[in-house]
Each structure stands twice: as structure tokens, then as C-alpha cells.
Amino acid sequence: MTSRIDKTIARQREKIASGAYYEAHQQLRVIAARYIKQSNYEAAAEILAGGATALLRAGSQQGASASGGDLAIMLVDEVYTKAGWGITGGDDDAEGRARKKRLIELLREFPSEEPTRKRFIQEMIGWSGRFGPVERGDAELHHAAGSVYAEDNEPYDAEKHLVLGTSESAETLAKLEYEWYTNDEPHTAAIYASRAVFPYLLVGNLRNANKAFLVFTSRLSSSNTSLGVQEVSSASSDVRVFPSLPLLNFISMLLLTIQRGSADLFKQLTAHYASQIREVGIWDDALSQIGEQYFAIKVPRQGNPLLDMMGSMLFGGQNQGGSRRTPQGRSQSKTVEAPPASMELD
């Protein structure tokens, strides 16, 4: 059977190489549908994956990549989903890992400008959420999708996936936010750092929040030696202090406060930086949610503050051209505030 499938794929690849994209696309759909009707899902998967790869590599000429995207989506909808293929996430789930690997490899074949890529990502994540242990989707697939968007400088789409990704996603997200920040005013560093930190806090991933902050601030300090970064040490903590960037210090202190679980310190911290936080204008919902989530501080609110905040601040939106733009709510003031008064670290 494998030899027969290999021959089928080879014939269709020859058609694709000769420019007969539409003919190859239609024949691959028919052949795959025949295997699906026979419940021979493995054969259908090989046919669709092989054909999709060849068409995607042919590029956008005469709709080749669109045809490849169609076959990739068919692979998820008509094979993975209909077959009920699942992933357990365990070390012994070799089949699940192989199925994810096939999807990730296909994803990387999509040209960045191919419109069907977004639909493929949605279907891929949806399948993993339905047939995997995590309803919001598999972390490795989220990381793959977020990384692709990050490489293509599509930060809003990248953020939505990287925040639900793996431990590696924190570094990818922090680097993305830092590169984005370098196109903005120097005093806006905390705005971009918060986009790498707050989403992880809101999904309960304190480890990734700390990692993202460390990566961002390390790049900031190494690229801007004139910042005059101060290292402050105590019996239990080592903290970088940025005298000219108070809100960056706020984020650093916030992470320490969450680790200690001190509601009183959280209230003290937010009160101390209240004027700067008000000036930012987009952190209120996030901080209210963090206060409730980590310190049981309930604040009366209407609607769903988590979804509202993510939609309006962290995950933003795009202009009609799909290009990057400045995060909403960025302060236009270029005033560099005075360094904060010392706070107890122990």
C-alpha cells in the first residue's frame, strides 16, 4: 500500500512540477476522498500531506499555494477530525507527536502571504483542543503558529498563540516585543514589556512571565548602556532597577509580589505607581484581574474584564493593511519620571 501511495504522490508531483496545479489539486482531492470513504485515514493523510507540500512549495502562481492550503485544511477536517485522532501529551504518545509534527511541517511550507494559512492554523488548533488534553489547544502547535507569525512580523497574531505555547514561547514573545519596541520611543519600554508579561500572568503561567521579562530587560540593558541600570540585591531577591523607566520597575516588583503572595504588598505597589499607571491608561483591567487571581482582591466590574482587556490591549488589532502599529493606549508624553522610592524587597 505504501508503495502505491508513493507512486500516486510522485505522479501528482510531476504534474505540479509541470505547472498543472489545478489538475493535480483535483485529482489529489478525489483520491484522498476515496481513501477517507474506505476509512483508510493513514493513506488519505499521506496523500493530502504530500500533495499539499508540493503545491505550497510551488508558490502563489496560478493559485498553487491556495490549492495546497485547501489540501492541508482537508487533512485536518476530513482526516484528523473524522478519524478522531487524538493526542495525550504523554511521553509515550508517539503517534500523537508524529501527527503534530506533520501539521507543523506543513505550516512552515505556507508562504507568508497565503490567505489559507490562517484558516489552517485555526483548524489545527481546534483539532488539538477537541482531541487533546487542553481545551485551548496544544502548546506545541500554539508555539509553532506563534513563531511563524513572529517571523513574519505579525505581532498581534503571534501574541495570541505564544501566550498559550511552550516554555520556549516566552523568549520568542519577549524578543518580538523588544524588536517592536525599538521602532518606538525609548520611554515606552514598559508598554512592550507588559505585552510579554501580563498575558502569561493572566493565564497563570508565572514561570513564562518571569522568563519573558528577563529576556526583554536583558536585551534592553545590553542595547542601551546609557540607561544606568542598577543591580539591587537582598537576602531573597536580585532586582534590576531602571531609574529612568519607573513602570519597568513596577513590572519587576509585581512579579516578585506575586511570587510572595502578599496582597498588602500588591496594594502598596499599585498605590505607589498609581499616577504612572493612570498615564498608561490600559493596564487597569489587567491589574484588577491579577489582583483577584493572585491575591483574592475582588474589584466590582461589569462584563468579562479578562476578555475585554485581551481584546483591547494585549492582543490589539490590525489596520486594514495588516501591518504592525503602535499598541493602543501608549502614552504620548515623553517625560522621564523620577526613579521610585526604595521599596522593601525582603
Swiss-Prot record:
One Pfam family of this chain: GET4
Subunit structure: Component of the get4/get5/sgt2 sorting complex.
GO cellular component: cytosol; TRC complex
Bias kind Polar residues: ranges: 321-335
Claim: Iron is one of the keywords in the record: no
Species for this entry: Aspergillus fumigatus (strain ATCC MYA-4609 / CBS 101355 / FGSC A1100 / Af293) (Neosartorya fumigata)
Function comment: Component of the get4/get5/sgt2 sorting complex involved in the GET (guided entry of TA proteins) pathway that leads to the insertion of tail-anchored (TA) proteins into the endoplasmic reticulum. Get4 and get5 form an obligate complex that catalyzes the transfer of tail-anchored proteins destined to the endoplasmic reticulum from sgt2 to the cytosolic targeting factor which then targets the TA protein to the ER membrane via get1/get2.
One GO term (biological process): vesicle-mediated transport
Family stated for the protein in its record: Belongs to the GET4 family.
Location relative to the cell: Cytoplasm
Annotated region described as Disordered, given as residue ranges: 317-346
The keyword Coiled coil appears for this protein: no
Signal peptide extent: none
Name recorded for this polypeptide: Golgi to ER traffic protein 4
Stored PANTHER family: GOLGI TO ER TRAFFIC PROTEIN 4 HOMOLOG (PTHR12875:SF0)
Classification via InterPro entries: GET4, TPR-like_helical_dom_sf
Keyword terms, alphabetized: Cytoplasm, ER-Golgi transport, Transport
